[in-house]
């Protein structure tokens, strides 16, 4: 009898629609690999739904709060359902950007300088000397990220408005110029490095990530061999320092601008990266010789408790 996999998707975070795309793509691929699949749009009744389903494993395709912060992982541990990706502690650590930086810095990984501030204080006066970046403590898909340029005399006022829905605390970080890089990690190995070039704008924002033609992915990234290898080393070190399991993706900046610092820093580690067939991790896996079906099969066969 084929293994029964519950693919968890949707949820109620701001990344719900992205999660539905990831979940449906994974479910379709698993069906193609011969698994019995139930698509589960996660809601408040998720404990009852999973108790009734009794799946052999859960593929976690959720993004954002509740899906990648240790919450759903804790529930799956309680219900004794083996699951994919990282466990409770690693998920909670990686989701909280400042605490993740503390752990990575202790492991020797270069991260941007920054500080946590109240959003209202950040709207009154610059928390750092521009240019800097303001971002929510625990969101993905570049939700709520603001770049404050040198020429900006006043800090972003949206931080103090009712339009800001990403929590009371924000992270202000020194802006790192240069190239946007990302590296996929699968288990105990770094699969490869992609450079991301937004078609419009200077950075990889929500539209560049998800709008058709919003960005160009250069795979493998055109880097000197020692830099390419260093990116992979940093991604793997960050993955291991945070205690990640299964698949993760590290996002980095490399400042090779004329007169730049040459800095290579890890911005964050995503424990629940996008999983459509055209998402970054599946692209990198395909370049490494792993089809999308083989990738999701590996993830399900790697599923376990106590992650």
Swiss-Prot record:
<dbReference type="GO" id="GO:0005737">
    <property type="term" value="C:cytoplasm"/>
</dbReference>
<keyword id="KW-0479">Metal-binding</keyword>
<feature type="binding site">
    <location>
        <position position="268"/>
    </location>
    <ligand>
        <name>Mg(2+) 1</name>
    </ligand>
</feature>
<keyword id="KW-0963">Cytoplasm</keyword>
<keyword id="KW-0464">Manganese</keyword>
<dbReference type="InterPro" id="IPR011127">
    <property type="entry name" value="Dala_Dala_lig_N"/>
</dbReference>
<dbReference type="Pfam" id="PF07478">
    <property type="entry name" value="Dala_Dala_lig_C"/>
</dbReference>
<dbReference type="InterPro" id="IPR011761">
    <property type="entry name" value="ATP-grasp"/>
</dbReference>
<dbReference type="InterPro" id="IPR000291">
    <property type="entry name" value="D-Ala_lig_Van_CS"/>
</dbReference>
<comment type="function">
    <text>Cell wall formation.</text>
</comment>
<keyword id="KW-0460">Magnesium</keyword>
<keyword id="KW-0961">Cell wall biogenesis/degradation</keyword>
<dbReference type="GO" id="GO:0008716">
    <property type="term" value="F:D-alanine-D-alanine ligase activity"/>
</dbReference>
<feature type="domain" description="ATP-grasp">
    <location>
        <begin position="101"/>
        <end position="301"/>
    </location>
</feature>
<keyword id="KW-0547">Nucleotide-binding</keyword>
<dbReference type="InterPro" id="IPR013815">
    <property type="entry name" value="ATP_grasp_subdomain_1"/>
</dbReference>
<dbReference type="GO" id="GO:0005524">
    <property type="term" value="F:ATP binding"/>
</dbReference>
<dbReference type="Pfam" id="PF01820">
    <property type="entry name" value="Dala_Dala_lig_N"/>
</dbReference>
<dbReference type="GO" id="GO:0046872">
    <property type="term" value="F:metal ion binding"/>
</dbReference>
<keyword id="KW-0133">Cell shape</keyword>
<dbReference type="GO" id="GO:0008360">
    <property type="term" value="P:regulation of cell shape"/>
</dbReference>
<feature type="binding site">
    <location>
        <position position="270"/>
    </location>
    <ligand>
        <name>Mg(2+) 2</name>
    </ligand>
</feature>
<dbReference type="GO" id="GO:0071555">
    <property type="term" value="P:cell wall organization"/>
</dbReference>
<protein>
    <recommendedName>
        <fullName>D-alanine--D-alanine ligase</fullName>
        <ecNumber>6.3.2.4</ecNumber>
    </recommendedName>
</protein>
<keyword id="KW-0436">Ligase</keyword>
<feature type="binding site">
    <location>
        <begin position="127"/>
        <end position="182"/>
    </location>
    <ligand>
        <name>ATP</name>
    </ligand>
</feature>
<dbReference type="GO" id="GO:0009252">
    <property type="term" value="P:peptidoglycan biosynthetic process"/>
</dbReference>
<dbReference type="InterPro" id="IPR011095">
    <property type="entry name" value="Dala_Dala_lig_C"/>
</dbReference>
<dbReference type="InterPro" id="IPR016185">
    <property type="entry name" value="PreATP-grasp_dom_sf"/>
</dbReference>
<feature type="binding site">
    <location>
        <position position="268"/>
    </location>
    <ligand>
        <name>Mg(2+) 2</name>
    </ligand>
</feature>
<keyword id="KW-0573">Peptidoglycan synthesis</keyword>
<feature type="binding site">
    <location>
        <position position="251"/>
    </location>
    <ligand>
        <name>Mg(2+) 1</name>
    </ligand>
</feature>
<comment type="pathway">
    <text>Cell wall biogenesis; peptidoglycan biosynthesis.</text>
</comment>
<comment type="similarity">
    <text>Belongs to the D-alanine--D-alanine ligase family.</text>
</comment>
<dbReference type="InterPro" id="IPR005905">
    <property type="entry name" value="D_ala_D_ala"/>
</dbReference>
<keyword id="KW-0067">ATP-binding</keyword>
